[in-house]
From Swiss-Prot:
InterPro entries listed in its UniProt record: Aldolase_TIM, RibuloseP-bd_barrel, Trp_synthase_alpha_AS, Trp_synthase_suA
Naturally occurring in which organism (per UniProt): Streptococcus pneumoniae (strain Hungary19A-6)
Catalysed reaction equations from the record: (1S,2R)-1-C-(indol-3-yl)glycerol 3-phosphate + L-serine = D-glyceraldehyde 3-phosphate + L-tryptophan + H2O
Protein name: Tryptophan synthase alpha chain
PROSITE patterns xref list: TRP_SYNTHASE_ALPHA
Gene this chain is encoded by: trpA
Positions of transmembrane segments: none
GO molecular-function terms, A-Z: tryptophan synthase activity
Biological pathway: Amino-acid biosynthesis; L-tryptophan biosynthesis; L-tryptophan from chorismate: step 5/5
Amino acid sequence: MPKTLTEKLNAIKAAGKGIFVPYIMAGDHEKGLDGLAETIHFLEDLGVSAIEVGIPFSDPVADGPVIEEAGLRSLAHGTSTQALVETLKTIETEIPLVIMTYFNPLFQYGVENFVKDLADTAVKGLIIPDLPHEHANFVEPFLADTDIALIPLVSLTTGIERQKELIEGAEGFIYAVAINGVTGKSGNYRADLDKHLAQLHQVADIPVLTGFGVSSQADLERFNAVSDGVIVGSKIVKALHQGEPIQDFIKQAVAYQK
């Protein structure tokens, strides 16, 4: 039976709408983790498809400066994986939450314990950017009988056969990495990016979402045209931290019609 995240995103796709997933850093709020529910409900009210929630880590190799600094602010607020899990148990939302974490915090907590503790929460997906596909067996057995999907990341340098290998049996969505580099580095897209995304979209049987560097209205239009939707991180994190208006951008993204 398909996992909840797969079903919800497939329903949005079937309705002819673009999927929009904002990223937020857990604990990057003046109230620390006590402000997480407020941020989630703010985004839920704007109609987002799902919400990616980052766990702060001191060595975030895939993150650009905006998200790295957000992680440091969160850690300064005392955020820990244990505290985040306890907070997530208290949050009620109809929007699927997708946890983005490096493997180290997960390993320190214990993968089995992490999955068990989140079983009755809104968490429906897990992204581990520094976990190679060959080591997915460190995590997958613990997710097999749960409603949490392990989300594969597919980079621009991935050939077609490797793409098929990475996405075989995947649930939730495929995270298509739009740039070779860290998050938030916009505008430096390869000339063959659209071709790469179209090819990935053709071989995938679950939604393909484009992330890393997506930050403008033009990006929304471009990537919704060649994939099923977008993930936006740095732009959202920066706006929330600085109190900048972000509602109109999110509303435009949510309202995108294929």
